[in-house]
Amino acid sequence: KKFLIIILFLPLFCFGQKQGNIWYFGDHAGLDFNSGSPVVINNGQVGLIDCSPFGTCHAEGSAIICDSSGALLFYCDGSTAWNKNHQIMLNGDSLLSTISSTQSSLIVPQPGSSRYFYLFTTDDFFAHNLQYGFRYSIIDICLDNGLGGIINGEKNLLLLDTVTEKLTGVRHANGVDYWIIVHKFHSDAFHCYRLSSTGIIDTVISHVGSVHPIEGANTWTAVGQLKASPNGQKLALVNGNATPAIAEYFDFDNNTGIVSNVVSIQTNPLWSYYGVSFSPDNSKLYIACNLNGNGVYQFDLSAGGGNPTAVVASKTLVAGTYNYLGLQLATDGKIYVARSPFVGNSYLGVISSPNNAGTSCNYVDAAIDLNGHAASYGFPNFIDSYDYSNTVSKCETGIAEQSDIEKLKVFPNPFSTQLTFSYADNEQAVVSLYNFLGQRVLQQTFTNYMSTNTEQLANGIYFYELRNDKVTVMKGKVLKQGQEKTSR
């Protein structure tokens, strides 16, 4: 039998994990890292799109997820989600973003689930003028015979209106949940959403750093990447269209979701910053500029013991020929560099040793030829601290059948001092109980019947989740009320 095992761990960049091993980006460009080195592929659907009446959208943001073997599950460009067969996923069209958003989308597995994924999107300034905001859809990978689909009624759900094109995620300090992070437009506010096994359960707002301004009627100051360090303790963002330009890094508490202690590393108010990435060991920060200040710059976050003045003084130009745009850390431990937005420039740059200081980071220009397919502005958006340990490609049973659901009885509801689970199946199952904060308060393996003492639990709503070895997932909620009265 298979048992659910949840391991608490510190967020690390795990080179052994393969869920970020396939990339689709740019103008039908792609890379496959499953062999250990990137292999160029061109079979994806991500590409330039018509944004009439505004023209052709630049290819900037996409998101992809694979299973633990590196096999593709699905991917998205902000407006459309495709399944592993490169067909539009069931209910996967008409998402409210476009590929022209810097970080148009982010795919996050629901903690504790091998079946459900959250697809987050941020709108773009070019085609939509940011009107659709920050939204999410829930994907059930077992729909459509295992090809996956967006659940009816769980699509384009609004979390926050008018955000920038910045979107990233961090593993929670508990090693299970995630923080999904965006930046409010025309504000200095970070909004951090906690995703747990029961859904989005908490929002933390931190007012820190620069206001991302509206300049006249123009929302183009929403562009630029936001990234988290692999250990989840730092954030960095850039905005090269603002006046003055913005380049900052922050402390991030991945237990509370609080952003604090801004440090500005903007050294020229006219530079056009776009891309940002941390090294795998969290010690170096890279920033890419296009147009004014074109180049890739390294900042040593350990300089002077992390003293901000020393960090700014450590700035080193490591690449300086083209208009450099998006940066992305890959599972091979290297940082990939989009060199130019123009069609016809089909080469990527690579920072081969990003942990090393200065030019010893070994930037290689034109390192990868994409076979005529331009990278354009950016790369797929990943959580660099992913462990993906609960991402499973198998979907043996598909959607839980009604007969399976009817096998489970949870009583009494409301409950007081005892809660009972009755599962009319002779197989072992694992039941987990979570409070409204998403904290697991109970986990137990049983066969057929289990009754547990709940006197220690506070009154309130609790969420249960049942799993068996067929990866069937059944969920529900129960209410804890005061002590039961004994009848006489």
Region spans (language model):
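Long, low-complexity intrinsically disordered regions
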Residues: 396-401, 407
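Intrinsic low-complexity/disordered segments
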Residues: 14-16, 399, 436, 440-441
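A general lysine-centric signal
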Residues: 2, 334, 477-480
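Beta-propeller fold recognition
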Residues: 17-398
